[in-house]
Amino acid sequence: MTGLRMHAAYFNISPRIKAGEAVQQDVHGIDGRGEVILDFDKDGKLLGVEILGAKSLLRPSTLKQAKRIG
């Protein structure tokens, strides 16, 4: 997904993800509206979920509760 403004969201499944710990990503495109990326560790355990195009894929109430970073 490309564009000047990409709205992203990240949901941690694991309480703390160390740099380099996510070694496998499974990317799912969603009808040209965005992507959902699952991050896994070396043992295949799910660490977190990244959503690109979050404004298109998440409910406004979910975005409103999100912690803003960056």
Model-based region annotation:
Residues 1-2:
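Short amphipathic beta-strand and strand-loop transition segments with alternating hydrophobic
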Residues 7-52:
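A short, structured beta-strand/loop element
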Residues 56-68:
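A short, polar/charged loop-to-alpha-helix boundary motif
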